[in-house]
Amino acid sequence: MKIEHYQMLAMRTSQEGHDRILNGCMGLIGETGEIVDIVKKWKFQSGDHAELPKDKLIDECGDVLWYCAELSTGLDTSMAKLYIKKNHLFDDMTKIHKTAPLEITVMRLAAMSLRPTMFLFDGIPEQTTRNIGVDYLEAQAKAEIVGIMSTVRDILEIHCSTSLTDAMEHNIEKLRRRYPDGFDPERSLHRIE
């Protein structure tokens, strides 16, 4: 699945008429927290020989990607263009992720998920925003989306033996089952998996 196709399909389940930037930022923080929780439970609560719950990790990585799509759409940009344009900057990050334990990588992911919020919502005084420029702040948030996507890609490839695009397809199939006619708040509250 191509990233631009994923973004279009993912937004089929986005709720109309809400603040996509705020929802995207909050969702990234929440979903990366779920990834951290999966790894924490695997590492510290499952015993020495427990197998990493890769299916759960893939599910949550897909949810992080959904919120990347939501935030990108809110910023009126293409995930694919961001990812292709900036991905070469993250080659060194991938080298680190290949040697770092998974728990360190997911903590980095969680820290990255906070940064778009910092750039877009941290209560920067209006005068400062005018001086720095909204375009600069949005550019920083877009760079963080790429960092998040690159880190998710590395988690998927290194620790789950799957690709970013496979996780995107998995996420879209999950959303089609959950919301066959598009987003429905009632189905969101009373999920049947």
Predicted segment positions?
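Flexible "arm" and connector segments at domain edges
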Residues: 1-193
